[in-house]
Amino acid sequence: TLDNIDYNRLNMSNVERIEIVKGAASSLYGSNAVGGVVNIISKVSAEPWTVNLNGRYGAYNEQRYGGTIGFNVGKFNSVTNVQHTQVDEKDLADGKTNEETEDWAFKKVYGDKTWNFKERLVYTANDHLKLTARAGYFFREREKSQTSKDRYRDFSGGVKGNYVLDKDKDLEIAYSFDQYDKSDYLPQDANDVRDYSNVQHSVHTFYNHTFVGKHILTVGGDYMRDYLMSYQFANN
């Protein structure tokens, strides 16, 4: 639905690289990947222990603080990332408030604050089996006015298993969950009213078979359950 892609959910401090895959790739990335895929690959801990702390301060009281803790010990590999940001509102209309201008939606950038938590744990049982689990939580509050604040939340998680049958064959099974909510917070009575919720459950599996060392046949399938409740729908 309109205006419901929240790029604030992306924590770029935890990104190792970005891949762009052109063309249809439904067998690898699900039925929605009909025109191409943008893969955002998160960092992997290569050292036994790693700690990274970062911060930034800019105009309009823009602040960003974050940290990453990772370890790679025995059969376990883990990366935990936390980030907090905040910024004051920016008036783009020479001092006029949004209510005083006709095209008010483009005259002010509201201030907001965010919290972002990510965890990924990988367990390599042996040369054939690898299990991956991930979880995340995102919260953003936008200072729309003194009587109302916009709140955005996201809960995500997933598990994945990779099994190598032999050097030419491997199998992957994965489940993922994502719930993105919007609500209006009314400070005067501490009331948080949810008016948007998008919940997705997805399961996919695929099998790869390599021929003559370079030709790969991939067979797979996926199932998705998508629930949407929105203020943009009548009587919803």
Please state what every model-predicted region is:
Residues 1, 30-34, 94:
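Short, glycine-/polar-rich solvent-exposed loops and beta-turns at beta-strand/coil boundaries
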Residues 1-22:
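Short acidic/polar hinge/loop motifs at secondary-structure boundaries
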Residues 5, 93, 104-109, 148, ...:
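Outer-membrane beta-barrel domain signature, especially the mid-to-C-terminal portions
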Residues 8, 31, 58-62, 108-114, ...:
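Transmembrane beta-barrel outer-membrane domains
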Residues 27, 39, 47-48, 56, ...:
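Periplasmic-side early beta-strands and strand-to-turn transitions of outer-membrane beta-barrels
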Residues 36, 49-51, 63-67, 115-119, ...:
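Hydrophobic, lipid-facing positions within transmembrane beta-strands of outer-membrane proteins
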Residues 79, 122-139, 152-236:
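Face-selective signature of the C-terminal outer-membrane beta-barrel domain
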